[in-house]
Amino acid sequence: MASGAVGQEIDKLVGTWKLVSASSKTSKGEQGEAPYGLSPAGFLTYTAEGRVTALISYGGRKALSGTGGTVEEQAEAFKTFLAYAGRYTLAGDKVTHTIEVSSIQNYVDRNLVRSIQFQDDRLLLITPPTLVNGKIQTVELIWQRLQASA
């Protein structure tokens, strides 16, 4: 593992986290739209080797009809699930995910920078302010550390 203060933060980060909530706020402090629907689910894994994997399923997803579903159902399934993997670096209170593979090809080779806060066994990731539907917003994702199975 890494040494020093950064090493201690990486040690706190390493593991698997389950998504607890996702919310957004406008630059005026108003509640924004639910970024992943009302009851999203997801997992986030950081390894000691500097790898990250993220999976987020929007709330309210419907099962496909039949074996593979209709074209419309497939499009909706794609729109409501995000998956990516790559490398991460930690610098101060920021974590950067460098995307190597993603369900959204446009994310590949992008850096996603998030402010990071630890609160007991919870991890808060906050996006930089971004223009969404004509309003500047930040998204806050709260993750709960999963304990190792006995």
List each language-model region with its residue ranges.
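Lipid interaction determinants
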Residues: 2-150
